[in-house]
């Protein structure tokens, strides 16, 4: 569907409101009436931009949140070629999650994993994220800045698990110390 500038803005507003709702403290089961109230749009507009209704809207919002998980880490995520690059990326990750607190895209995605189509979006996100981290670890290994005996893909998976765990602790406590510790320990392991 080709949209006018105004149509793109309306669709974007609907997606932003849905994503914001998904990141709220207890989103529960969102309804189209909830989205209408948040956006000031009519049911007709919702179905114009999302003919598949609630399922299509939620999946589009989930895709947007997945894009934010990677986008929020740029450009540092794609510059993991040395220790300083990893330190900059780690600092950016911690700063972003500290800013977002419990209302982060990663947590919202995991909370919606059972929504139709969400598992595929989350799997693709995690594969992309792991691939980028793996490339960074291999670049460090090639430069002699990371231990050569480390399996880059396995360490990348562990980094993601550490971030996810740190985010869950952040959601419960409001503190980033677990996230910071996980990132620091992974870098220390690679640097041995």
Where are each of the predicted segments found?
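N-terminal intrinsically disordered/low-complexity leader segments
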Residues: 1-9
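Hydrophobic alpha-helical connector segments
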Residues: 71-102, 152-159
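Amphipathic alpha-helical interaction segments
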Residues: 13, 88, 92, 108, ...
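Amphipathic alpha-helical segments used for helix-helix packing
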Residues: 85, 98-117
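Helix-turn-helix
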Residues: 13, 17, 21-60
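Amphipathic alpha-helical packing segments from all-alpha helical-bundle domains
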Residues: 70, 84, 103, 117-143, ...
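Amphipathic C-terminal alpha-helical segment
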Residues: 96-99, 139, 159-177, 189-192
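Short, basic, alpha-helical segments at the C-terminal edge of helix-turn-helix-like DNA-binding modules
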Residues: 62-69
């Amino acid at each position: 569907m080709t949209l006018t500038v105004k149509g793109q803005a309306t669709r974007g507003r609907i997606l932003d409101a849905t994503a914001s709702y998904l990141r709220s403290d207890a989103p529960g089961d969102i309804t189209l009436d909830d989205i209408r109230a948040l956006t000031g749009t009519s049911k007709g507009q919702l179905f114009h931009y999302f003919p598949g209704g609630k399922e299509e809207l939620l999946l589009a919002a989930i895709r947007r949140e997945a894009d934010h998980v990677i986008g929020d880490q740029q450009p540092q995520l794609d510059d993991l070629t040395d220790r300083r690059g990893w330190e900059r990326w780690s600092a950016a990750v911690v700063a972003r999650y500290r800013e977002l607190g419990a209302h982060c895209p990663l947590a919202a995605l995991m909370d919606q994993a059972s929504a139709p189509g969400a598992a595929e979006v989350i799997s693709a996100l995690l594969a992309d994220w792991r691939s980028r981290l793996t490339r960074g670890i291999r670049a460090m290994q090639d430069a002699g800045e990371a231990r050569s005996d480390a399996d880059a893909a396995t360490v990348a998976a562990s980094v993601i698990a550490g971030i996810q765990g740190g985010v869950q602790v952040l959601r419960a406590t409001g503190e980033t110390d677990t996230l910071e510790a996980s990132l620091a320990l992974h870098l220390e392991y690679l640097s041995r």
